[in-house]
């Protein structure tokens, strides 16, 4: 029992080390995550953000927003909380599969500090990642029948679908399997079977009524746009040319290569099979190599991060050789024979992962899809470790061996403290802090390329930079009634060669603007004097 408490202490300490100083070294990252944040800040039923844009994740943000009113603090809190929950979920999952306490703690801590955790953006993928690990652990720990197991798996698939819509496939597949087992087990489980099925139906129908169908919807299909964008990513690499910098340019290039009538993957297969086949085979190669890279990153790069001596490969090889020497191979083989794979449990795992396996092959192996492949990697590792038997070493009893492993892990966590207890430039967060301190007297009309408007206290109107086309920037500002222009480094680069903007720089005062520095990296704000 003391060993269990020591393990929990190490896991909690590692989590604290990882996130306690997060706002001081991690900058805000714009993109889909800030879209979800914005949906959470303005969350309502019916959900206005669109059923394919994570309504359940937006509700999660909305819940925490009750306790954390400041949007920037909410952003960092969510990032930290999900990072910690991911590590805890990994620990519970591998423990449920029979991995020893010390090994499970090591695996969880290495994941916590890996590049697959805190750096992962958008963070929304961690939510279904935790749900999947949680339900897979639950069906291992509870002596449930297969009908109950797949009802729970199906429900979790539906919950995940309201974070990432592709998981609706998991919901449907698990539901089909659950119906099969309900029919097969109806005679055995009659007293409680209908109660389980009834609860499932109520929850599933309720979620559909609240949010709608996340996959088969009349809204603009995210998968279609994602396919077009990521075909362009591959095409640009094949042609050894830079990727287009805007979504509009990406879609233009897609139709230039594939044809104006090609929109979906099905269209591409019919009309451009050669390009489509090359796209898919490229994705398969990238998926395999990326997953191998992630495994090496977690269990090697994370372990030796900060120590770049040429000896570290030798040390890693030495540790591996000692471990291989300590294995009792005869007993291990016997364990594999005695403990077969939980076949239907594995089917449940694959059912939950199928959408991401398909997505990486047909669309692109993006990091927020690959995180789910790690579930399969963890399962394989747990399958092997739970059946390994080590030789008995006279000088070391089982308890002392486990204690020593955890003691070494505690030293590893301590070494990580300086890496995460530091300050680093956070220019985007500094911009957010500056603009949220303002109290404008009128509604803001914002010209920007990022998502700063999400953090503004009051509602604002977003003017797209692509609307500026005539070369007279001052006239454009007047015509659009723009009163807020945040000139980040990205905006300065975007307008850097524009003569109309250069002219505006010399006359902004006459247009009623003042110029305010917003961070130490050279960003500044043009804001109408009348707003202050």
Task: Indicate where each model-derived feature is located.
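Membrane-interface anchor segments at the N-terminal boundary of transmembrane helices
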Residues: 73-77, 120-121, 276-350
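Juxtamembrane membrane-water interface segments immediately following transmembrane helices
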Residues: 35-38, 169, 193-264, 439-454
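Transmembrane-helix motifs of polytopic, lipid-linked glycan transferases
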Residues: 77-98, 134-136
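Transmembrane-helix signature of polytopic, membrane-embedded enzymes
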Residues: 5, 90-116, 131, 147-150
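Hydrophobic/aromatic-rich transmembrane helices and adjacent perimembrane loops
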Residues: 41, 126-132, 160-164, 169-173, ...
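Signature aromatic-anchored transmembrane alpha helix within multi-pass, membrane-resident enzymes
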Residues: 102-105, 148-155, 175-176, 194-205, ...
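Extracytoplasmic catalytic/substrate-binding loops of multi-pass membrane glycan-assembly enzymes
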Residues: 22-39, 48-64, 70-73, 218-226, ...
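Membrane-embedded, lumen/periplasm-facing catalytic core of multi-pass transferases
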Residues: 94, 229-243, 405-455, 460-472
